[in-house]
UniProtKB/Swiss-Prot annotation:
The gene is isiA. This is Iron stress-induced chlorophyll-binding protein. The chain crosses the membrane at residues 25-45, 89-109, 138-158, 208-228, 240-260, 303-323. It is found in: Cellular thylakoid membrane. Keywords: Chlorophyll, Chromophore, Membrane, Photosynthesis, Photosystem I, Stress response, Thylakoid, Transmembrane, Transmembrane helix. The keyword Protein biosynthesis does not apply. One of its GO terms (biological process) is cellular response to iron ion starvation. GO terms for cellular component: photosystem I; plasma membrane; plasma membrane-derived thylakoid membrane. It comes from Synechocystis sp. (strain ATCC 27184 / PCC 6803 / Kazusa).
């Protein structure tokens, strides 16, 4: 991380992963622990939403944020978008809780038993040691991340085509997608109007296209070191890599916010409520187009606005760490204001 020439910087507990930036083993332990927390939240909150779910009311009117995603995947849904069985949701929530325990055990193992520095290992584990100034090793780690993302996209396509299908809001049924769109021109054509997609075949085809693209990119980054032009354009440091990651998450968050707000195929009104209106007050926000009792909000409103504001703050983090990576010292701003006061 950026230390401005001070090699004796001490990070407190609240600094998070910055404490382990130069300890590859503990860095992995922290990531596994964070995955455990994420899985625990997903499992626990799924079970909480099941306890609050009222089948006599529309799902989108109940402020739920996890069950609508599971319903969109076709689990427990009958014709017309009616929820007929919540047991699959209980199973999925329980699996996430079990997975969180396994991941938590892995985090403890990497913290207590595995070396803090993977360079001291022998065998295959040593290849996952990294330093921020080593572009080739960072490329290998990036490649493995892309492989998992690609596998996730293809798993969704597999669920749509072979393992039960997805909920189709246009027919209000759960169906298999036997002929996904594989024409790259059609898929790439959505670049300018992606939020208007209304065909489940196109949606699944897009996941297949992106899945193979990610896997191809993952293999490339594992086998091929960063090219010369990339080394000249990009900064390779912990601060810079963090800024790139935050920028990517911010972009994904803004896209997801708008897509969730207006699209009714990936986010069926039966589960999320009707599309939202884009409003501008002190800041932009997405507003419900229906009035619910007690001034409640639809699931779509919660998700779209949460994604927007989280993306906004991720963007601020991207700019902060990008400037630090370039060498800008924010303490100089404070010093400048202090000099004005004196």
């Amino acid at each position: 991380m950026q230390t401005y020439g001070n090699d004796t910087v001490q990070y407190e507990w609240w600094a998070g992963n910055a404490r382990f930036a130069d300890q590859s083993g503990l860095f992995i332990a922290a990531h596994v622990a964070q995955a455990a927390l994420t899985a625990f939240w997903a499992g626990a909150f799924t079970l909480f939403e099941i306890s609050r779910f009222d089948p006599t009311q529309a799902m989108g009117d109940q402020g739920l944020i996890l069950l609508p995603h599971l319903a969109t995947l076709g689990w427990g849904v009958g014709d017309g978008g009616q929820i007929v069985d919540t047991y699959p949701y209980f199973v999925i929530g329980s699996i996430h809780l079990i997975a969180s325990a396994v991941l938590g055990a892995g985090a403890l193992f990497h913290t207590l038993r595995a070396p803090a520095d993977l360079s001291t290992l022998k065998g295959q584990g040593k290849k996952f040691h990294f330093t921020w100034e080593n572009p080739q090793q960072l490329g290998i780690i990036l490649g493995h991340h892309l492989l998992f993302l690609g596998a996730g996209a293809l798993l969704l396509a597999g669920k749509a085509m072979y393992w039960g299908g997805l909920y189709d809001a246009t027919t209000q049924t759960v169906r298999l997608v036997s002929q996904p769109t594989l024409d790259p021109l059609v898929i790439y054509g959505y670049q300018t109007h992606f939020a208007s997609i209304s065909s489940l075949e196109d949606l699944v085809g897009g996941h297949i296209f992106v899945g193979f693209l990610l896997i191809g990119g993952g293999i490339w980054h594992i086998l091929v070191p960063p090219l010369g032009w990339a080394k000249k354009v990009l900064l390779f440091s912990g601060e810079a890599i963090l800024s790139y990651s935050l920028g990517g998450i911010a972009l994904a968050g803004f896209v997801a916010a708008y897509f969730c707000a207006v699209n009714t195929l990936a986010y069926p009104p039966e589960f999320y409520g009707p599309p939202l209106a884009i409003k501008l007050g002190i800041f932009p926000y997405f507003a419900d187009t229906v009035e619910l009792p007690m001034h409640a909000h639809t699931s779509r409103a919660w998700l779209a606005n949460a994604h927007f504001f989280l993306a906004f703050f991720f963007l601020q983090g991207h700019l902060w760490h990008a400037l630090r990576a370039l060498g800008f010292d924010f303490k100089r701003v404070e010093q400048a204001f202090d000099s004005l006061q004196t």
